[in-house]
């Protein structure tokens, strides 16, 4: 299967599908349609019924081959790639039997080394797909797309493998946080699903952050600095004061595991007006609410010293910890755990320090944990995919399809 995985992933990553957070359309970029239409064509070539809607959501169905009712399971992956780095002219490179030595990424001066990326030590002997250093690879999440396609193809070619009804979804704009926004859960009509959008071998994730975005605006009074005493209010200084009142250790670079944080994404402005953009993250809902409350308290503590309340805070929730919706249905995790065990894969159920489409879909009525794809160093030139781990991910999808038949409706 390795050759098929390499061929399919190479073809898909060469199609530029970068999303654009500045766009208001869905998909956010026209070029995402290029891969979506190709996938529709290939799925129909498998003999599947498909539907590609006006918003770029591609659904397909592999019908059940058993005579009794079992739950409908879904598998999802997103077609867009991150806007954080160049995604055009992707030139994938293959490293056979990775020996652990430093790999030069083309002529860019960039290298892939175990010193910088110690997780590579686990991949010695694997076949890797890497970049030439000039672009991201796009294995996030085209590896997931490939794994679903190859698993479906295998099930079609091996009708002796029994499975229930399987729904497939390829979606746009996950990288800019909009993946599930126009996902029609009712039309998808699955009982539960799995996103193939994880990273390291063995990941089985059903806990995500609670997430919000906060925009802070500070308003100043700008006068000539030579006569500014007791008159000038510097909006930049107010912004700095606001940030300094947050806990210094509760930032991404100083937290791990279940620890939440405030992350200052952008700070810009002048004496008259400044803006600070934060993301707020915490796995615990109560702690998450307290973090948002903290921002409002800081606002009030600063504003009390001014007549015109110069600090404004706007907070918008983005998604919630999907464990709230998945844990009441333990079989959704028990099924892949059984498959992992059968394949001698040690499950890593550590919480996601982020979110997936499943975070939002779970709250829309489709409980959706996340499974590994075998890729790493997403969103930049050091991105890689282990073809060996991708092969295991395909086996997991096939195994889940089989295992679901033991859970009658």
Swiss-Prot record:
Binding-site residues for Zn(2+) 1, renumbered to this chain: 78, 140, 197
Active site: 80, 174 (proton acceptor)
Name assigned to this protein: Peptidase T
GO cellular component terms given for this protein: cytosol
Transmembrane segments: none
Biological classification of the source: Bacteria, Bacillati, Bacillota, Bacilli, Bacillales
InterPro entries on file: ArgE/DapE_CS (IPR001261), Bact_exopeptidase_dim_dom (IPR036264), Peptidase_M20 (IPR002933), Peptidase_M20_dimer (IPR011650), Peptidase_M20B (IPR010161)
Subcellular localization: Cytoplasm
Family recorded in the similarity comment: Belongs to the peptidase M20B family.
Presence of the UniProt keyword Repeat in the record: no
MF GO annotations: metallopeptidase activity; tripeptide aminopeptidase activity; zinc ion binding
Function recorded in the entry: Cleaves the N-terminal amino acid of tripeptides.
Reaction catalyzed: Release of the N-terminal residue from a tripeptide
EC number from the UniProt entry: 3.4.11.4
GO BP term (any one): proteolysis
Gene source species: Staphylococcus haemolyticus (strain JCSC1435)
UniProt: Zn(2+) 2 binding residues: 140, 175, 379
Reported cofactor(s): Zn(2+)
Annotated keywords: Aminopeptidase, Cytoplasm, Hydrolase, Metal-binding, Metalloprotease, Protease, Zinc
Cofactor mode of binding and number, as noted: Binds 2 Zn(2+) ions per subunit.
HAMAP family xrefs: Aminopeptidase_M20 (MF_00550)
